[in-house]
Amino acid sequence: MADNTRKPALKKSGPKEDRHFVTALARGLELLACFRSGDRLLGNLELAERCQLPKSTVSRLTYTLTKAGYLQYDSGSGKYRLGSATLALSSVMLSRLDMRQLARPLMQELADFSRSMVSLGMRDRLSMIYIENRRSQTALTLSLDVGSRIPIASTAMGRAYLAIISESERTDILERVRELDEILWPKIRDKVERALDDFATYGCCTSFGDWQPDVNAIALAFRPADGTAPLSINCGGPAFHLSPEYLLKEARPRLQELVERLRRTQEAM
């Protein structure tokens, strides 16, 4: 598999000023992204806490987004839900991801073989968001579904993504991770560096108890042939069922084969 033996560099850089960056637009998009899987209604106070913005700023943003159709105001609760314009964007994005349809049967094969959960994800800022999910019917799996978000720096899926992107993009992402938690950053950085070593050694990235102490996973990222953003596929589940040895020895070759089959299928289309 291409590029699986070259260890990506990991560097640190300071924050960058960008005169082309539109702060008001970024805040509006950040507010929309505060709605998580399972959220039905959120008020200005909840949104302000999640976005870490003043409530007055959030009030102006929700007013504008409601006028534009990206939020819908619920008069009974005084809160907001995502509007039809937002849902239309999501629908268009998912409809373009033909990889989901191609991946489903292959992901199910791996899930059944390993009695685990196999998920396909893409990056959204400092998270990976599940866009497809397949579970084994014969084993306990994690309670995550399409739309679930997991952190980029502590999960196998996120680390696999970091391993294949450009050095400049990786540096920018990790700088934002550092800004979120200066105290834990040295530990996070060391874990990411170790994950890049895993990528060079095994051709995949790992997270054995790093995200959650009772969860083990491996993952591999790849660039779709159609030029869209990189995607990651993980294979994971409860640590008592999926040992690191099993995942690396038994599941890893099948995960690598899955990605190769996806590439070949998409290139032939």
Where are these regions (language model features)?
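Short, solvent-exposed recognition segments
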Residues: 2-11, 139-211
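N-terminal helix-turn-helix
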Residues: 2-101, 260-268
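Residues at helix C-cap/C′ positions in short coil/turn segments immediately following an alpha-helix
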Residues: 38, 114, 124, 200, ...
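A structural signal for short hydrophobic beta-strand segments in well-ordered beta-sheet cores
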Residues: 71-73, 120-121, 222
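Amphipathic alpha-helical effector-binding/dimerization core
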Residues: 76-176
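Cysteine/selenocysteine-centered motifs that mediate thiol-based redox chemistry or coordinate metal-sulfur cofactors
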Residues: 172, 178, 256-269
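Extended hydrophobic
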Residues: 185-261
